[in-house]
Amino acid sequence: PLAKMLHEKHPGVRLMVDNCYGEFVCEKEPSHYGADVCVGSLIKNPGGGLAPTGGYIVGTQDAIERIAYRLTAPGIGLEVGSYAASYQPFYQGLFMAPHTVAQAIKTACLAARVFEILGMTTTPAADEPRADIIQAIQMRTPERLVAFCQGIQMASPIDSMALPEPWDMPGYNDQVVMAAGTFVAGASIELSADAPMREPYTAYMQGGLTYTHGRIALQMALNRMVEQGALTLK
């Protein structure tokens, strides 16, 4: 493995993995393969849809101790807290996370299969192994892409009345369209979709707190695409 080779050649080097979107998808995490540190976001997979903010760092005792001293102060480390409100939603979300991630993966597999049947390219395919919760779907036309995102937004629990339109988002060379009617802003473990407005007009869908909601959202997205004349169902 890469980690073993790295540690043998450079014993003082620490290997860090950004595992955002990947937690609880596979049977083993990067730390099982020798990563010294893994980091990610608590408003994504490991927060289970309940964590309101924050990120996490896990790793070897030596690595975490060094990080803690840098974060706070030497000698203090982890002896001080970081969130005054309450840690309950973080721990409860972590408890729920494996199940919630499973719901998101089932939603992604369903989306992949549905759009494969409609003749579109999906990555990964419905029957391919997965390492994260992201599902890419090549919509091929801008009209189809926008209609899909609008349908996902219409099925959202928050701001379902909003209709996403492409806009000039800072940091991107192309216009971007986003559907994200989530309880927690930026929580990609909740069902959302986004895409740059460029060929092949690929939608990146992720999340889904429940498989039931994922199925409803996909149905509404297909309906929106048909209503807008972007898709014809035989």
PLM region spans:
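Conserved C-terminal alpha-helix-loop-beta "cap" of PLP-dependent enzymes
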Residues: 116-233
